[in-house]
């Protein structure tokens, strides 16, 4: 069991290390998300850079690279503790990708994918929490933070045996959002639609001249 679990942890890290945001931006001829916008290679930044379809692709593939390793581990009968380590490995790969000089994203979509095999009802609650918070506040990061804080309680309600590994995953996501928390506290965080609205205003001004 330990050999299989360790193998799955390595596999999960390598899956997580495939930075979909960087690859998709290259294919779509969008700016490098690591050096443009917020500097975060994730779906929200890709959306800010002007690619709705590209952002959707990033989101889907980021979810899958967290979901697939955990799903395989779940099918192999790994206990909750080891499944938690597999999930964390996938997120660590996304955050510190070995294939992209260890400069990765925040791990939110990958964490969501890693939680999905526990149950679709839980996944629905997580997505709903993120969407509701993000739409009401305009801050994608706040949606991620609130979802990470609530996730262990959701899991405890539905499948308590997975509470500890999900709590570890939530801690990782919250640590990655330390800078966002600081900016939110000081009122300096960018809203989801702020950059796109600014670009539209510039386009309107240019069209008048």
From Swiss-Prot:
It comes from the Bacteria. Keywords: Cell inner membrane, Cell membrane, Lipid biosynthesis, Lipid metabolism, Membrane, Phospholipid biosynthesis, Phospholipid metabolism, Transferase, Transmembrane, Transmembrane helix. It is a multi-pass membrane protein. Catalyzes the transfer of an acyl group from acyl-phosphate (acyl-PO(4)) to glycerol-3-phosphate (G3P) to form lysophosphatidic acid (LPA). This enzyme utilizes acyl-phosphate as fatty acyl donor, but not acyl-CoA or acyl-ACP. This is Glycerol-3-phosphate acyltransferase. Pathway: Lipid metabolism; phospholipid metabolism. Belongs to the PlsY family. It is an enzyme of class 2 (transferase). Its EC number is 2.3.1.275. The chain crosses the membrane at residues 4-24, 53-75, 80-102, 112-132, 138-158. The keyword Cell cycle does not apply. It is found in: Cell inner membrane. Its main location: membrane. Probably interacts with PlsX. The keyword Lipid biosynthesis applies. InterPro entries: G3P_acylTferase_PlsY (IPR003811). It holds the Pfam family G3P_acyltransf. GO terms for biological process: phospholipid biosynthetic process. GO terms for cellular component: plasma membrane. GO terms for molecular function: acyl-phosphate glycerol-3-phosphate acyltransferase activity. It catalyses: an acyl phosphate + sn-glycerol 3-phosphate = a 1-acyl-sn-glycero-3-phosphate + phosphate.
């Amino acid at each position: 069991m330990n050999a299989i679990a360790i193998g799955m942890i390595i596999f999960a890290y390598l899956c997580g290390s495939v930075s979909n945001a960087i690859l998709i931006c290259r294919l779509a001829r969008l700016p490098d998300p690591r050096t443009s916008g917020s500097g975060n290679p994730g779906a929200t930044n890709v959306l800010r850079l002007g690619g709705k379809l590209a952002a959707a692709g990033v989101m889907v593939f980021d979810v899958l690279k967290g979901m697939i390793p955990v799903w395989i581990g779940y099918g192999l009968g790994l206990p909750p503790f080891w499944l938690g380590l597999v999930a964390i490995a996938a997120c660590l790969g996304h955050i510190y990708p070995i294939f992209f000089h260890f400069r990765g994203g925040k791990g939110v979509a990958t964490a969501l994918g890693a939680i999905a095999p526990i149950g679709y009802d839980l996944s629905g609650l997580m997505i709903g929490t993120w969407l509701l918070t993000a739409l009401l506040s305009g801050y994608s990061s706040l949606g991620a933070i609130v979802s990470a804080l609530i996730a262990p309680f959701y899991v405890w309600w539905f499948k308590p045996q997975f509470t500890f590994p999900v709590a570890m995953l939530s801690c990782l996501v919250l640590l990655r959002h330390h800078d966002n928390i600081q900016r939110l506290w000081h009122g300096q965080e960018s809203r989801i639609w702020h950059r796109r609205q600014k670009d539209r205003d510039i386009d309107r001004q240019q069209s008048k001249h």
